[in-house]
């Protein structure tokens, strides 16, 4: 029976036994040098250890070995995103999607790349798709709501932010954005103030929430 070095390495990685993981992934690569998965796993390990240059080389090697390795494109995209190389990261997230990567994360990260470049309309379909795939993911639903607010699509943003608050009452960002939504798109200043107050009560250093709350109060007087 063949030893599955990748499984051994992943288990060690999950248990934060990084040296054991590195040894196992090395053995996986030596056993199957023409398979991308060992290189991807080693790249992921190196990225977690903040050895970015070597991680990049392993992801690139995985792509050379198998140009359809979706997880290699995704791992390399994450490195570039963290390095604020958003245009390059976006291309790689697209490739990971083209090659069939599963789940919502690649759609979400591709949307974030476009957001970083202030290309909000380009971000929208990818963030929407992420929310459709992972409807219970609070981070994605909040990001989708904020993006809709940025595009002044308040009618669609409101239920997204309300969902986040229903699921995570202590989410100051959701309260803040819902408060701003009420302030700029409705005449319901009471709800605007309520959610803004919740935001800076939950997070006392949330100066922007307090500033807008005070501004509304002054306007009402």
Label every model-predicted segment.
Residues 1-4, 8, 181-221:
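Terminal, low-structured helical/coil segments at or just beyond the last alpha-helical repeat
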Residues 6, 13, 40, 47, ...:
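Position-specific recognition of the canonical hydrophobic site in helix A of tetratricopeptide repeat
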Residues 14-27, 49-61, 83-95, 116-129, ...:
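Structural signature of tandem alpha-helical TPR/SEL1-like repeats
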Residues 27-49:
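Short, charge-rich amphipathic alpha-helical segments embedded
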Residues 31, 65, 99-100, 133, ...:
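Structural marker of alpha-solenoid helical repeat scaffolds
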């Amino acid at each position: 029976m063949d030893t599955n070095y990748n499984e051994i390495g992943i288990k060690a990685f999950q248990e934060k036994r990084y040296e054991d993981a590195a040894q196992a992934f090395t053995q996986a690569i030596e056993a199957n040098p023409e398979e991308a998965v060992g290189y991807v796993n080693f790249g992921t390990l190196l990225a977690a250890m903040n050895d970015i240059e070597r991680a990049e080389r392993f992801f690139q090697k995985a792509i050379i070995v198998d140009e359809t390795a979706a997880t290699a494109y995704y791992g390399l995209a994450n490195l570039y995103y963290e390095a604020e190389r958003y245009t390059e990261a976006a291309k790689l997230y697209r490739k990971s999607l083209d090659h069939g990567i599963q789940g919502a994360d690649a759609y979400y990260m591709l949307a974030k790349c476009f957001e970083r470049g202030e290309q909000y309309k380009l971000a929208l379909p990818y963030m929407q798709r992420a929310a459709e795939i992972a409807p219970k993911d609070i981070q994605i639903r909040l990001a989708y709501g904020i993006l809709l607010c940025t595009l002044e699509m308040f009618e669609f943003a409101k239920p997204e932010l309300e969902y986040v608050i229903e699921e995570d009452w202590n989410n100051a960002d959701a309260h803040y954005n819902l408060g701003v939504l009420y302030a700029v798109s409705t005449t319901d200043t009471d709800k605007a103030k309520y959610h803004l107050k919740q935001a800076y009560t939950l997070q006392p250093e949330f100066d922007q929430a307090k500033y807008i709350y005070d501004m509304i109060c002054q306007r009402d007087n």
